[in-house]
Amino acid sequence: MKTISEGYLNLQKSLHENENYGTASISLAPSVKKLFTSNNFKSISDYGAGKKNLQKTLLKLGLKDFKYFPFDPAYPEYGLPEPADLVCCIDVFEHVEPEYLHNVIADLKDIIINAGFFSIATIPARKTLRDGRNAHLIIKPTNWWLSLFLSTFYIEHLQQTESGFIVLVRNNSYVMPPKS
């Protein structure tokens, strides 16, 4: 299933040459670590991993003994998306070409074993593509994104941020455990 056009992939590769591009996961790593450890997860799939800053920061924070599966079309050496207990998709959705958004959501649905941690900006990016477009190709409000996710995911938690929101999702087949 195609998730990116060849032309846009080339634009993304050139953006990834900038050392300051793809750093959003660094500040979110403490939240990812807390979620990971509190749920006794064993694996993380980093969808849109870029330079693997999430993995590097989790290791610096002391998270050990976890399987890490990076995926990013700009880094074909990472391979295909892999299923994991926790699938992180940080600062990715807003960069997806609109015509491939449903394919990306389907990809994520297929690899989430337990939970998905999505961080999405709802404002324009500070960076522009070589062709002059804003790096955020999809700039929509939180409710637009949530309505898109509701047919595929169970929304467990939503947190608004300064530039967008973070959402914790489960596949729609998820059943909430009884409260003790």
What is each of the regions a protein language model found here?
Residues C88:
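A conserved beta-strand element that flanks and buttresses the S-adenosyl-L-methionine
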Residues A125-D131:
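A short acidic, helix-capping loop that chelates divalent metal ions and anchors anionic groups
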Residues M1-A84, E99-I105, I111, G132-W144, ...:
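Conserved N-terminal segment of class I S-adenosyl-L-methionine
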Residues V92-H95:
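Hydrophobic adenine-recognition pocket in adenosine-nucleotide-binding enzymes
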Residues I112-T122:
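Conserved beta-strand signature within the Rossmann-like core of class I S-adenosyl-L-methionine
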Residues P76, P124-A125:
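Surface-exposed, flexible loop/turn segments at secondary-structure boundaries
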